[in-house]
Amino acid sequence: MKKAYLQECPPVLREYLGYTETIKGRSGNTVDEYFIDLRTFFRYIKQIRGLCPAAAGPDENISILDVDMALIRSVTLNDVYEFMNYLKTERHNTSKTRARKTTSLRMFFRYLTDYKHVLDVNPVQNLDTPKQKKGLPQYLTLDQSMALLQSVDGEFAQRDYCMLVLFLNCGLRRAELAGINLRDIRPDHTLIVRGKGNKER
């Protein structure tokens, strides 16, 4: 997790994020996303509860360092649904983004109720996930793929060509490709790729 984010974390949130990274084995990027989602939520809660000065300005300026168990215990399912509405209407978040934030909230409150036992009732236990549009995957035709490979030029043409071949033939994610090191290339012409959750594939 980024050090800058740690400095913004109240103790309860710092403990949770440490747990997800060290015990649950989530990647640093995933933990950062959890933090951003929870920070957005608690900034919203502080705003609707009148717990931040009017002069604070945009919610990006609202500190969550003072978020404690008393505030967390006051959260209701209705608060969360209003937050989801705020994300859609004010922040124009897509259903996919809202679904991720729903997951972040579910995991945090489950941690507090089932693991830490500091909450008697999980306010998001019955939280519905925003419905997501499911579209067909987009792909390049063979001609488009060939044209893309033929367009590679410049000082790093060989590297770029190899990267495109891996993208096209292996279906790698961007982070998976960026994470490949020389030691991942084996003498038997195979490649180890570390996927989400640091899983080898």
What are these regions (language model features)?
Residues 1-201:
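Conserved catalytic core of the tyrosine transesterase superfamily
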